[in-house]
């Protein structure tokens, strides 16, 4: 019989087969109904609902909390009332005890948890404590802080992230010979959180009995501060250091927080020395975290540091196509975009995968099933209000200067009548960039390139569009110039 995530499941037929009485799950259900009413949804959901009812080593019934902090709160604030309600509802007088998960396992608590159809008590569950993987092998609940959509199946690997992806896969498989700790770093929106979530899900799937703790650095800070205020730091340490795999997202947030850095340093040291796995993410490499404690920074550098690079164009298109498939499953529309729309999104949103996916979400929300019929002009109109705030306005003159500098030529050459390839190809690239990065019409672009007509510009745009798919050098040139222009 189990209570997990606010749902009670009961079947004590094996543990209490000789006792003609109400199943323990039914009794606990009655207790929880009263406690929820008396404590309120927030307190009940935070402290009581995450508990698990287990059979103790001597046949008693034990309320097992996921953390020592939760155990101490229940003992201090609610245990007297819990005991009263249990006694009043259990006619056979079964003894009820309270232990944290580590306590229960250390005294040889039964690993048996009987299962049956659940008696539902749907309650809000707090995520203020570190999230532990369930010991019964069931899929963890989203309230643990993990997002179900972030898995290896939905992660799109490419040159920018394939090494980090391979490392995450290896850690999740519990393979021997891993580096420890592992730190993934890269700017906001590069896929770090997705990778860490995927790693956690896969690690729990591969080894259901292992203990996995996933939390953000902000959660680490807030939980540690609360533990200090409640004088529960020992319980806090107990929970983190009992993990087989500890994952902390955005560890750079801890920099400058002296006591929290100290605690993380000792936790990291203890876990690594004990052969447990530790994984972090941050927005920069350890060497660049100058405000972080030197000892902690050194430990973060001591394992394997994996950088995630900006997604290249092919990877961005792959991400868009995978996202389209997900949207089609959710909403039932045809998972396609016009080629010019797909290319526009991949070329326009180059700095962050989140921005890229956000643009597609916006189109889906606005157009619904009609998203596959949107023209480039309609897409540009829809996304115009959603472009990055304060983005630098790029002019055709900016494009001409950046292109000529990149190719080592004079800007005046782009405006000349010269047609040799060394000049014609950069000129076509600059025209293509002008079409992508400005709102100027084709005739206007032509006028600013030495008075050419719009058909010349259209030919240049189509030529570059066709070439860059098969010419990685040209594709990289366009990306480099674009990044320089956007600064």
Swiss-Prot record:
It is found in: Cytoplasm. The keyword ATP-binding applies. InterPro entries: AAA+_ATPase, Chromosome_initiator_DnaA, Chromosome_initiator_DnaA-like, Chromosome_initiator_DnaA_CS, DnaA_C, DnaA_dom, DnaA_N_dom, DnaA_N_sf. Residues 1-92 are annotated as: Domain I, interacts with DnaA modulators. ATP binds at residues 189, 191-193. GO terms for cellular component: cytoplasm; plasma membrane. Keywords: ATP-binding, Cytoplasm, DNA replication, DNA-binding, Lipid-binding, Nucleotide-binding. It comes from the Bacteria. Oligomerizes as a right-handed, spiral filament on DNA at oriC. Belongs to the DnaA family. Plays an essential role in the initiation and regulation of chromosomal replication. ATP-DnaA binds to the origin of replication (oriC) to initiate formation of the DNA replication initiation complex once per cell cycle. Binds the DnaA box (a 9 base pair repeat at the origin) and separates the double-stranded (ds)DNA. Forms a right-handed helical filament on oriC DNA; dsDNA binds to the exterior of the filament while single-stranded (ss)DNA is stabiized in the filament's interior. Domain I is involved in oligomerization and binding regulators, domain II is flexibile and of varying length in different bacteria, domain III forms the AAA+ region, while domain IV binds dsDNA. This is Chromosomal replication initiator protein DnaA. It comes from Caulobacter sp. (strain K31). The lineage of its organism: Bacteria, Pseudomonadati, Pseudomonadota, Alphaproteobacteria, Caulobacterales.
């Amino acid at each position: 019989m189990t209570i997990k995530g606010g749902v009670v499941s009961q079947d004590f037929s094996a543990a209490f087969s000789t006792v003609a009485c109400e199943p323990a799950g039914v009794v606990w259900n009655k207790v929880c109904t009263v406690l929820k009413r008396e404590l309120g949804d927030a307190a009940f959901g935070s402290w009581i609902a995450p508990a698990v009812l287990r059979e103790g080593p001597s046949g008693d019934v034990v309320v097992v909390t996921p953390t020592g902090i939760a155990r101490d709160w229940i003992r201090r604030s609610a245990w007297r009332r819990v005991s009263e309600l249990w006694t009043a509802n259990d006619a056979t007088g079964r003894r009820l005890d309270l232990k944290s998960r580590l306590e229960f396992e250390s005294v040889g608590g039964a690993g048996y948890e009987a299962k049956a159809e659940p008696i539902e008590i749907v309650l809000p569950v707090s995520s203020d404590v570190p999230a532990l993987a369930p010991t019964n092998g069931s899929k963890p609940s989203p309230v643990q802080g993990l997002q179900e959509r972030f898995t290896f199946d939905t992660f799109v690997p490419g040159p920018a992230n394939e090494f980090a992806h391979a490392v995450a896969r290896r850690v999740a498989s519990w393979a021997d010979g891993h580096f420890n700790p592992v730190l993934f770093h890269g700017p906001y929106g590069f896929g770090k959180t997705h990778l860490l979530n995927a790693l956690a899900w896969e690690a729990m799937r591969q080894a259901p009995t292992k203990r996995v703790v996933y939390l953000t650095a902000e959660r680490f800070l807030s939980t540690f501060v609360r533990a200090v205020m409640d004088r529960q730091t020992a319980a806090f340490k107990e929970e983190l250091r009992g993990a087989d795999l500890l994952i902390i997202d955005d560890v750079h947030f801890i920099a400058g927080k002296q006591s929290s850095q100290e605690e993380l340093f000792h936790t990291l040291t203890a876990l690594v020395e004990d052969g447990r796995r530790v994984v972090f993410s941050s927005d920069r490499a350890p060497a660049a975290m100058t405000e972080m404690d030197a000892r902690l920074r050194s430990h973060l550098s001591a394992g394997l540091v994996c950088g995630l690079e900006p997604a290249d164009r092919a990877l961005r298109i792959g991400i868009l196509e995978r996202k389209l498939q997900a949207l089609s499953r959710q909403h039932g529309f045809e998972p396609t975009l016009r080629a010019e729309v797909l290319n526009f999104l991949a070329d326009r949103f180059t700095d962050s995968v989140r921005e890229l996916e956000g643009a597609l979400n916006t189109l889906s929300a606005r157009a619904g099933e009609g998203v596959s019929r949107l023209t480039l002009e309609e897409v540009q109109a829809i996304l115009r209000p959603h472009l990055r705030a304060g983005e630098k306005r790029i002019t055709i003159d900016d494009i001409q200067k950046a292109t000529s500098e990149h190719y080592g030529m004079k800007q005046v050459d782009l405006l000349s009548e010269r047609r040799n390839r060394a000049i014609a190809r950069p000129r076509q690239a600059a025209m293509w960039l002008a079409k992508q990065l400005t709102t100027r019409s084709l005739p206007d672009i032509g006028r600013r390139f030495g008075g050419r007509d719009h058909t010349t510009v259209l030919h240049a745009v189509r030529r570059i569009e066709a070439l860059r798919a098969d010419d990685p050098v040209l594709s990289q040139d366009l990306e480099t110039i674009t990044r320089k222009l956007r600064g």
